[in-house]
From Swiss-Prot:
Belongs to the UPF0246 family. GO terms for biological process: response to hydroperoxide. This is UPF0246 protein Bpro_3713. Pfam families: H2O2_YaaD. One of its GO terms (cellular component) is cytosol. InterPro entries: YaaA.
Amino acid sequence: MLFLLSPAKSLDYDTPPHVSTYTKPLFTRQSAELIDVLQTKTPQQISTLMKLSDALSGLNVARYQAWSPKFTAKNSKQAVLAFNGDVYGGLDAKTLSEQQLGWAQEHVCILSGLYGVLRPLDWMQPYRLEMGTALATGQGKNLYQFWGSQIADYLNQRAAAHTSPVIVNLASEEYFKAVDRKALKARVVSCVFEEFRAGKYKIISFMAKRARGLMVRYATEHKLLTVRKLEGFDAEGYRFDPAASQADRLVFRRRQAA
């Protein structure tokens, strides 16, 4: 069983990693191609393309210029420890043991506009490149056309090696769209997290993001290998709702945050 996550805009390269184990990203040739395109852009062009402030566009232009095909402990950090948004607050990878991170390495994939797919312990240099960015390359007008079926092909390869070839989609729509569903062979199961507000259950974005990270942590701590086991997820007050769920759409609800 493979768990898919989106990356985060917020990054933490200040906190030293608590583990030294790392792997190299798999799609560095493609990343270098994208960096070559990004390095031709001015801060104003990046600001317009990505809808960023002048300060953020300047920061990311500097990141593109500094990016190197050689990944080192000085310019990189393990992806799951570098990302720092709502999802990663729920996952809280800095408190996972090296053994638990090793399990996550085999069962978690982080989708990325620049890196395609990152494993948790893959070294990552800082960047900002949302998957929905309309960055024109030799492969087309946006990143979906750039990546094509490459991400799905890789996920097929990974899923086929598992006893349960299932992909648990915990990524956003923007990122999961980069997985070519026609090319993807594995069964896909999605998880939905809802809060009780004003008399009904609804998805609240930042809470749902945190819950996705909590789900991956739960799976990692319990070494879950089947969809049925996911139904036991109960972190921070969530409970599986069988009546609201379908075979490939698991709904978790809570009346109030625990």
